[in-house]
């Protein structure tokens, strides 16, 4: 990386490291693996910085690479069912009250059990607040596929919640 890129690279790391780590953590459920993925993503950013056209493009690029690396890691290591809140110090997108919520922790446990395409779509939709069109662009998938994955993922998550979270339902 040329010296001219150093301040820009450092700014991008400062602005987006929480988001990158959080996405990797939600996708893998493994803190160590999420840290590895985040490091790999920023090393790739270092090599690709000259191709980044704007701040919006950088954010899009980081999300896409993080999701891709997380998916690859999940396929390699076949990580399953881990409490995502354990030892998580700085969580992007949720307040402290939500992080400590037993219901939130249980939902995270259920989320990690979803098939990867559905989990990826739901994480990008509800953690990153992306539109289905933005999710399709990030994942490189057709819009119809993304909408289907969101619908199937929500349906499956609701079914799992109805079975596993009865203590949180009134009158149950």
Where are these regions (language model features)?
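A short, charge-rich alpha-helical start-of-domain segment used by transcription regulators
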Residues: 1-22, 32-35, 46
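C-terminal edge and immediately downstream basic/flexible tail or linker adjoining helix-turn-helix-like DNA-binding
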Residues: 2-9, 101, 137-138, 155-172
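Sigma70-family region 2
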Residues: 2-3, 39-57, 76-78, 160
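Structural recognition of an alpha-helix C-terminal capping motif at a helix-to-coil junction
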Residues: 22, 36-43, 56-68
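Arg/Lys-rich amphipathic alpha helix in sigma70-family domain 2
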Residues: 53, 64-85, 100
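DNA-recognition helix of helix-turn-helix
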Residues: 67, 71, 139-165
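Internal acidic/polar
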Residues: 80-104, 109, 131, 170-171
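A short pre-motif secondary-structure segment
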Residues: 121-125
